[in-house]
């Protein structure tokens, strides 16, 4: 459920024009500092080279990188694209907070699921 909310909030960023789409465009925007990038979201099925490139650039420019549990096709669909999208970057502070809120909810749900799994396996 939270995954849907997360993808919907990313789609909202796209509709608001507060999203940079694609690894080359993100790297160029970071280098040129044309738009302030708040958060980079990467698909889970990226190649090692793409993942390293995003990780290195986000570290160098001090931008948070989050790897989603969503493949590139699903990420692309969330923003209205028909193909694979490796990464997107959020440029609006308020929308960034919305996306981060949904990321935090998803992580807390996952940690609850993990602790429940541990409890159920220890009682068996």
State where each predicted segment sits:
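N-terminal first-folded block
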Residues: 5-42
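Signal for well-folded cores of large energy- and translation-related assemblies
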Residues: 11, 31, 59, 80, ...
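N-terminal positively charged helical leader segments and presequences
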Residues: 33-55, 63-64
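Charged, alpha-helix-enriched surfaces in structured cytosolic catalytic cores
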Residues: 1, 5, 49, 70, ...
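Short, ordered loop/turn segments at secondary-structure junctions
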Residues: 24, 45, 70-73, 93
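Mid-chain, well-packed structural core segment of small domains
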Residues: 54-85
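C-terminal structural segments of small proteins and small subunits
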Residues: 76-114
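Charge-patterned, long linear interaction tracts outside catalytic cores
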Residues: 117-124
């Amino acid at each position: 459920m939270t995954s849907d909310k997360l993808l919907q909030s990313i789609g909202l960023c796209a509709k608001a024009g507060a999203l940079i789409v694609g690894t080359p465009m993100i790297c160029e925007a970071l280098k040129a500092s044309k738009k302030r990038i708040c958060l980079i979201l990467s698909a889970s099925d990226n190649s090692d080279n793409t993942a390293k490139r995003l990780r290195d650039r986000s570290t160098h420019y001090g931008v948070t990188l989050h790897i989603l549990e969503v493949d590139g096709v699903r990420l692309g669909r969330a923003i209205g694209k028909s193909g694979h999208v490796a990464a997107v970057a959020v440029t609006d502070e308020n929308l960034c907070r919305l996306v981060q809120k949904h990321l935090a909810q998803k992580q807390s749900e996952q940690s609850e699921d993990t602790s429940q799994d541990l409890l159920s396996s220890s009682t068996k």
